[in-house]
A protein has these predicted regions:
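RNase H-like, Mg2+-dependent phosphodiesterase core
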Residues: 1-215
């Protein structure tokens, strides 16, 4: 597993073509969503694009509006091969967030309906896959396949958090998606820690200690 760097702006198929020359087709892009939040799972997605049906406007999910992400999600799932992996809070707390993320990426690649010849991974670490993998820092802004994976992972996780918010009102997960915002912090202080909070994360540990002192 090796790393790749590139200064080119905007996602394209350059890195996919490089890997195709080395390993053949198809190439999967893999990305994750939700490493930093205090609550909820980390979600990874793997995408093999159909280069004859590329959705217009693919980009890093963080640069797109929610409405645009939803529209692209529908286009990607309608034209590409997609796999999703979800590491729950129990796995995050047991293994740590990095290992849980790598496991989710492995699950996402394994869930693809077509086996990739190689994979591009967003970031600087590669999971252990059944195919060659290369890490690409800022891959979601450089590779169309990774950008597509970032959209699938982000939309999937946002939908999960919206559902969890219905069962656990008061933490504003429908807005903050489990990230450490002021309204989430207020919810922790007022309502306590839920089963969906990551107890290995320091802000959640602090809330547990504070709640114990208050009892």
């Amino acid at each position: 597993m090796t790393g790749v760097s590139d200064s080119q702006a905007g996602p394209c198929l350059t890195h996919e073509k490089i890997l195709m020359r080395r390993h053949g087709a198809p190439i999967a892009g893999i990305d994750e969503a939700g490493r930093g939040p205090w609550a909820g799972p980390v979600v990874a997605a793997a995408v093999i694009l159909d280069t004859a049906q590329l959705p217009e406007g693919l980009n890093d999910s963080k640069k797109l509006s929610e409405a645009r992400r939803e529209a692209l999600y529908a286009q990607i799932t309608g034209t590409a091969h997609v796999g999703v992996g979800i590491a729950d809070v129990a796995r995050i707390d047991r293994d740590n967030i990095l290992q849980a993320t790598l496991w989710a990426m492995w699950q996402a690649c394994k869930a693809l309906p077509r086996t990739p010849s190689a994979a591009l991974i967003d970031g600087n670490r590669c999971p252990a896959l059944d195919c060659p993998a290369e890490a690409l820092v800022k891959g979601d802004a450089l590779s169309l396949s990774v950008a597509a994976a970032s959209i699938i992972a982000k939309v999937t996780r946002d939908r999960i958090m919206a559902e969890l918010a219905k069962a656990h009102p008061g933490y504003a997960w429908e807005r903050n998606k489990g990230y450490g915002t002021r309204d989430h912090s207020d919810g922790l202080n007022q309502l306590g820690v839920t089963i969906h909070h990551r107890r290995s994360f320091k802000p959640v540990q602090a809330a547990l200690q504070q709640n114990a002192l208050s009892d």
